[in-house]
Curated annotation (Swiss-Prot):
Keyword NAD found: yes
Gene label: dapB
Family the entry assigns: Belongs to the DapB family.
GO biological process terms held by the UniProt record: diaminopimelate biosynthetic process; lysine biosynthetic process via diaminopimelate
Cellular compartment(s): Cytoplasm
Assigned EC number: 1.17.1.8
InterPro entries, sorted: DapB_C, DapB_N, DapB_N_CS, DHDPR_bac, NAD(P)-bd_dom_sf
Positions annotated to bind NADP(+): 38
Acetylation in keyword set: no
Protein name as it appears in the record: 4-hydroxy-tetrahydrodipicolinate reductase
One of the record's GO cellular component terms: cytosol
Binding site for (S)-2,3,4,5-tetrahydrodipicolinate: 156, 165-166
Length: 266
């Protein structure tokens, strides 16, 4: 397979570290640079615990793109930084794979239009775990037969956004197969505000944040005399790397924006 030159934004994060290891063990991936505002001017190999890769680190993406030739930007930073990075990447005609969440519908619409105009491949993935993507697809299928559904997403206590991008994407897919319905008693009240979670077209999303968790989600469907639960668990960040690899390889052949890994797997 042809070599793919990759820039990683956020190499010191837990996802970023796994992505660096992915670069090292994948023959056709070449890590040509990284973005880390604290370690500009150093190399990946200078960072504690990192493999012996000589990829230079830049403090900002602007400077990096001026000096480095790359095929794909892999962004694993924060929602705020990720939005800035994908906007710049599209402007510069650089393909990107974005693993941060928190994009609004309006932001996604604008990015989709910009990517289409520039004909630049872009993938925004709320979740890179193949199992999580299948969970979302199975939930979408089940929604045709079960109108009553609630989502419980559980993540580590350092996650910044709630509900998770995976939960939001799951609800979006369920809504495509489900007639809008308010669940529970029509006169239901909350004795404590927020007790029933976020409400999207009658679908309640509950967010749990605890140390010891990584990324987990349950989609619970209820029917007469029965329940169906679709669950996925990621026990470490290595679970996301198969999706990262697939996304980097796939974005090379795209000329538009794709939101969600479910749109690039068969």
């Amino acid at each position: 397979m042809k070599e793919i030159k990759v820039i990683i934004a956020g190499p010191r994060g837990r996802m970023g570290y796994e992505a660096v290891l992915l670069m090292e063990r994948t023959a056709h991936f070449n890590l040509v640079a990284a973005i880390d505002y604290k370690h500009g001017g150093e190399k990946i190999s200078d960072l504690p615990g990192m493999p012996a890769l000589d990829a230079p680190i830049y403090a900002d993406l602007h400077t990096c793109l001026d000096e480095v030739e790359a095929d794909v930007l892999l962004d694993l930073t924060t929602p705020e930084i990720g939005k800035k990075h994908v906007t710049l990447a599209v402007e510069r005609g650089l393909r990107s794979v974005i693993g941060t969440t928190g994009f609004t519908e309006e932001e996604l619409k604008q990015l989709t239009e910009n990517a289409k105009e520039k004909e630049v491949g872009t993938i925004i993935a709320p979740n890179f775990a193949i199992g999580a993507v299948l969970m979302m697809k199975f939930s979408q299928m089940a929604a045709k037969y079960f109108q009553d559904v609630e989502v419980i997403e559980l993540h580590h206590d350092q996650k910044l956004d709630a509900p998770s991008g995976t939960a939001v994407k799951t609800v979006e897919l369920i809504r495509q197969n489900r007639v809008p319905k308010e669940q529970g008693h029509p006169n239901e009240t909350e004795q404590l505000e927020g007790a029933r979670g976020a409400n999207v077209d009658g679908i309640h999303i509950h967010s749990v944040r605890l140390p010891g968790l990584i990324a987990h989600q349950e989609v619970m469907f209820g029917g007469d005399g029965q329940m169906l639960t679709v669950r996925h668990d990621s026990f470490n960040r290595a679970s996301f790397m198969s999706g990262v690899k697939l996304s980097i390889e796939t974005v090379m052949n795209l000329d538009h924006l794709v939101y969600g890994l479910e749109n690039i797997i068969d």
